[in-house]
Structure formats: C-alpha cells, structure tokens
Amino acid sequence: MSQETEKDLEQTQNEELVEEAQSDEKKDQEVDPVEAAQAEAAEYKDKYIRAHADFENAKKRLEKDKMNAVAYANESFAKDILAVLDSFENALSAIEGANKENAAEVLEKMQEGVKLTYEQLKKVLEKNSIKEIESKGTFNPEVHQAIMQVDSDEHKTDDIVQVMQKGYTIKDRVLRPAMVSTAK
C-alpha cells in the first residue's frame, strides 16, 4: 500500500472512532423520558414542600403577631394613664400630711392638683382618640341614651334638656352613650 492510501485509511479509521465516541456520548446524554419526568416531579415536589413549609411558618408568625397585637393593644394607653395615677397618688399623700393649721392651704393645692390631673386625663384620652360626645341640641339615638323625658316650655320635643352622664367615642365608635333627659 502506498503511503497516501495508508494515511487515508488511518484518517478514515480515526474519523470512525471519533464518530463512534460522539455517538456513545450522545447515548449517555440521552435520558429516558420516564426518568426525566420522575426527576422533574421530584424537583417540583421538593419545591412544593419547601413553599408549603414557608407558608405555614409565615402563617404561624402572623398568628403570633396578631395575638401579641390583641394582647398588648392598650399598652400605650395604659402607659399614658399611669401618669394620671401618679398624680392621684401625689394628691392622696398631700392629704395625709394635712392638719388643722394647713388645711386651707392643702385644700387649695388639692383643688389645683385635681384640675391639673383632670386636664392631664383629658389629654391622655384625646391622644388615644377618645372624645366627648356633643350633647346639645336634638337627641340622637346613635350617641345618646334617654334616661327620662321632662316637660319643658323652653325646649322643642326631643331636644336634650340635661346631660346626666357624658358619653364618649373612640375614633368613630361609641364607647359609652351620653345619658340625657329630653323634652316631651
């Protein structure tokens, strides 16, 4: 055989070996469709399990936050009202120190202290969206509760004559209706 023929033969054999190796690689790379589907299903199942666990954890966290919000909803109000309590305690201790000689002075200071404490309490209520219900004019059953009716030449029927107990709202909700007497 000539050298060229020998080279051609060798080159052809090399090409056949390369093609055979590539064919074997393709066969190795080709995956059974059932196995591929099973692997994909397993991957989706794993993702589902993780997502479900994340969802359940978030749900538990939200429930805990909700319970804490309900349990401590009035914490801010309670802190504010403690200052009013302190004022009352100071007033009571001032009374304990009173005697006949300083009774007038203590009474005057008590009156001033009660006024200041009243204003302090009103500010706490206002800060917490608690407002007094306006109880002048015509009776409104949504915010007033009629305790009695009285004869009155000065007022029209269903006009409020007297407020027995003030009413209050918290935001837009009636906390306690105003107790009133109305004209017949």
From Swiss-Prot:
Basic and acidic residues composition bias: residue spans: 1-10
InterPro entries: GrpE, GrpE_coiled_coil, GrpE_head
Region (Disordered): 1-38
UniProt family annotation: Belongs to the GrpE family.
Organism for this UniProt entry: Sulfurovum sp. (strain NBC37-1)
Keyword Chaperone: yes
GO biological process terms held by the UniProt record: protein folding
Pfam family, one: GrpE
PANTHER family linked to this entry: GRPE PROTEIN, GRPE PROTEIN HOMOLOG, MITOCHONDRIAL
GO cellular component term, pick one: cytosol
SUPFAM superfamilies: Coiled-coil domain of nucleotide exchange factor GrpE, Head domain of nucleotide exchange factor GrpE
Function summary: Participates actively in the response to hyperosmotic and heat shock by preventing the aggregation of stress-denatured proteins, in association with DnaK and GrpE. It is the nucleotide exchange factor for DnaK and may function as a thermosensor. Unfolded proteins bind initially to DnaJ; upon interaction with the DnaJ-bound protein, DnaK hydrolyzes its bound ATP, resulting in the formation of a stable complex. GrpE releases ADP from DnaK; ATP binding to DnaK triggers the release of the substrate protein, thus completing the reaction cycle.
Record's keyword terms, sorted: Chaperone, Cytoplasm, Stress response
Subunit structure: Homodimer.
Protein name in UniProt: Protein GrpE
GO MF: adenyl-nucleotide exchange factor activity; protein homodimerization activity; protein-folding chaperone binding; unfolded protein binding
Subcellular location: Cytoplasm
